[in-house]
């Protein structure tokens, strides 16, 4: 079986649906929706709000979009965290007590990053998961950073970010209807499970193939499903 779509962002809904039905799939000539860089970047921001001690997430976003916090500063933060047996986030919170031997400009940038995360955590208490993600995108100017290249790839990345927002909105709707937890934490747990399942898949197992129309050229399958046959979306008018 093969499922074809026009844009890569359309794979999110298909992947989620197949996963819920325990149907194995593979992304032909590409990577899973939740493994795409722009998606992992936004998810890292959301993970930081739930657990500021998530150092993998912190290192991914502390200088993205670029805010002048370089690799040398991150190394100093890591060394200090190991020395004082604290998380990197705790080190940043205690810059007035820990001498990192950094200049005042860098210290200000770290303080601004800290304040941003703390503000998001406060806002998170009164917003749902979708609203939090939307706020993060706007306040960090993540989409603007993606758009600045002006390339087709940049457009695709922006579409992916928008599709993640759609996914969060769908998650909230489904969970509320089912009377289950619709929090940001619950969403991130579901994404983490999906990511783990993707990592466990073996190449030799029979799976549904997901791919864009462009990637399907020259390939043949007994059964082919084409999704998103909509005006202004599928090919050109």
Predicted segment positions?
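Accessory C-terminal helicase-associated subdomains
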Residues: 65, 95-215, 236-237
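A short beta-strand element within the Helicase C-terminal
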Residues: 40-44, 207-236
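Conserved residues at beta->alpha junctions
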Residues: 5, 104, 228
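Conserved motor-region signature of P-loop NTPase helicases/translocases
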Residues: 1-59, 148-159, 166, 182-183, ...
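C-terminal helical "lid" of AAA+/P-loop NTPase domains
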Residues: 75-80, 93
């Amino acid at each position: 079986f093969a499922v074809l779509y026009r844009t890569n962002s359309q794979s999110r809904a298909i992947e989620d649906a197949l996963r819920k039905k325990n149907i194995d799939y593979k992304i032909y000539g590409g990577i899973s929706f939740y493994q795409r860089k722009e998606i992992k970047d936004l998810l890292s921001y959301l993970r930081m709000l739930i657990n500021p001690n998530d150092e993998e997430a912190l290192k991914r976003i502390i200088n993205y979009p670029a805010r002048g916090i370089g690799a040398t500063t991150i190394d100093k933060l890591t060394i200090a965290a190991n020395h004082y047996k604290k998380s990197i986030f705790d080190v940043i919170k205690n810059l007035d007590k820990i001498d990192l031997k950094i200049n005042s400009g860098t210290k200000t940038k770290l303080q601004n990053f800290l304040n941003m995360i703390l503000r998001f955590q406060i806002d998170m208490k009164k917003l749902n998961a979708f609203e939090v993600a939307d706020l993060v995108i706007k306040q960090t100017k993540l989409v603007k950073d993606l758009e600045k290249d002006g390339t087709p790839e940049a457009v695709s990345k922006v579409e992916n970010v928008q599709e993640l927002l759609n996914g969060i909105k769908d998650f909230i709707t489904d969970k509320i209807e089912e009377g289950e937890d619709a929090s940001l934490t619950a969403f991130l747990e579901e994404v983490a499970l999906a990511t783990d399942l993707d990592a466990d898949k073996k190449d030799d197992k029979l799976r549904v193939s997901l791919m864009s129309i462009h990637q399907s050229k020259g390939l043949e399958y007994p059964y082919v499903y084409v999704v998103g046959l909509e005006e202004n979306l599928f090919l050109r008018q």
